[in-house]
Amino acid sequence: MYKRQVSEQCFYGSSGYGYGDMGRETLDKVYAQAFGTEDALVRHNFVSGTHALSTALWGVLRSGDTMVSVTGAPYDTLEEVIGIAGTKGSGSLIDYGVKYKQVDLMSDGKPDLDKIALEISDAKVAYIQRSRGYSLRPALSLSLIHI
């Protein structure tokens, strides 16, 4: 945090538009550095995990791109965002031309690495859901999903 010069000023309010908001930009850089990522988006406005995930998916995927869920079905609430459930034409990723594939877990609850290798060759996003969500399967360990 000292390297990025985080100070009390980073937490002051702004105009709301975010133009030149030193605090937002600084905290994004701190999170990116802490998690070893290219970039980060840190906002108090995300109201749920589905909101955060859908923002990330909409930010990355475009018409013609493919998303592959490599750990079976996603969260129930994410199914409508993707377009595999809910009303057609309501503005899902599929409605906007994103292709969706799914690789189910094997009977022992582990990812099917052979099928995953086949399906992700043309994918823009390989979606890994570690949490069991509302399903009855156990959560996946980090060692199990580290590919």
Question: Model-found features: residue ranges?
Answer:
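Conserved small/polar residues in nucleotide/adenosyl-binding loops
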Residues: 1-5, 145-147
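Glycine-rich phosphate-binding segment of PLP-dependent enzymes
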Residues: 3-37
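Conserved beta-loop-alpha segment that forms the PLP phosphate-binding cup at the N-terminus of a helix
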Residues: 40-67, 74-85
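Structural signal for conserved beta-strand scaffold positions within catalytic alpha/beta enzyme cores
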Residues: 42, 69, 102-104
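PLP-dependent aminotransferase-class I/II
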Residues: 76-79, 84-143
